[in-house]
Amino acid sequence: MLDFIGQANKKYNFEEKFAALLSNTTHSVSREIKEGFVSAPKGCYIQLEKIATKYVLDNISTSYDRTSGLVVRAASFTEDTGLPLTLGNFLDYYHLDPRAIYSKKLCFARLCVCARVVDDFAEPLEETLTKAFARFAVVDSRRWIRFLLDLLPKLDDTNFSQLSPIEQRMLQMFYVTIWGKAAEDWNSEEVLDNLYALSDSSVLLGELQTLLQYRYDHIDFIDEPVDVGFDCPLDLHCTYTRDQLLVALDFPKPATVREGVKWLPEKQLDVFFVTLNKADKDYSPTTMYNDYSINENLFHWQSQSTTAENSATGQRYIHHREKGSRVLLFVREFKTDSRFGGAAAYTYLGTVNYVRHEGSRPMNITWKLDRPIPARFLKKTNKLIVG
């Protein structure tokens, strides 16, 4: 097929057109164009002439890659579309991921101020919340979102220490997402000041609620609770940052976890953090573990290089059912988000059970998942699938 690209209208959305052809990539459309569309579907080939490439890259750069392009679109949004300028309308009309805004360290309310379509504002937590919005932009747990949407409008009237254990865990997940550490005491002055200050940032708090509702409305899979031996708020196949999932498991210092495994003796849980595609610059030869799904029910996992099969840890992996412990599997494709920046979040694949192993230091273990990997994840987790 031949397509002739000339000086298109500056508001024409080339990025959307090419993104529709590249659903399998984690890279930006601009990067795909520059690298020759390496993520095009199997059997497809996309070639742009030099001048056409420049037109398309310039269009994308001035439209969405730069803050200035977003500001221009916000300024004329209602005139161009006939729709009120809201976060949801803006994202849906331009087919944007919320992180296209929040990765630029910009909140939507500030974007609208820059576009001169709303009055300026000054709020104490603007910088703090704006940094957190990119992390909230990937939240996809219905249970957690419902809890937050119920809690946020009544922060000033809530006794946080009186919340149920599972509600306090969900609040911890919220707290660590914004302030980067767990709350040690719900009655401490620092914690209360932080939470109550949210009500003094009404514009940003309102945007957070809007973002959460937007995420809730766009969840396209069925999640469900996972039995881990206590009332845990983590739901199957949902996305969590390392800090969020660790505080949900009652581990209060997530920043201290540097390895891809964590044993929680009080909960009798082994937690595995798996990065499927490891870059040489991010991992040493001793941490380039070979992890992948064999099929929808089995997962191949390589232990740390120091773990021997006859060690206490190795024996716990092999005999976890007899010993009464559980193994939780969290998986991500890459360490960093190459499109929007920052650490990539993990998908919760649930509990797994030992099947067999080979070798020692490291151990190559095959695990059976209690719930099968959904088809939409399987292509990313299974290195044996081509195209």
Residue ranges and their predicted role:
Residues 1-14:
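SF2 helicase/translocase ATPase core recognition
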Residues 6-9, 334, 359:
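Residues that form or immediately flank small-molecule/cofactor binding pockets and catalytic motifs
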Residues 11-158:
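Long, largely alpha-helical accessory region at the distal end of helicase-like NTP-driven motors
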Residues 81, 99, 154-161, 181-183, ...:
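Short, surface-exposed beta-strand/loop "edge" segments at domain boundaries and coil↔beta transitions
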Residues 114-118, 122, 126-134, 234-345:
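Acidic, glycine-rich low-complexity segments with interspersed aromatic residues
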Residues 168-271, 277-278:
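Charge-dense, extended regions
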Residues 338-387:
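Compact mixed alphabeta submodule
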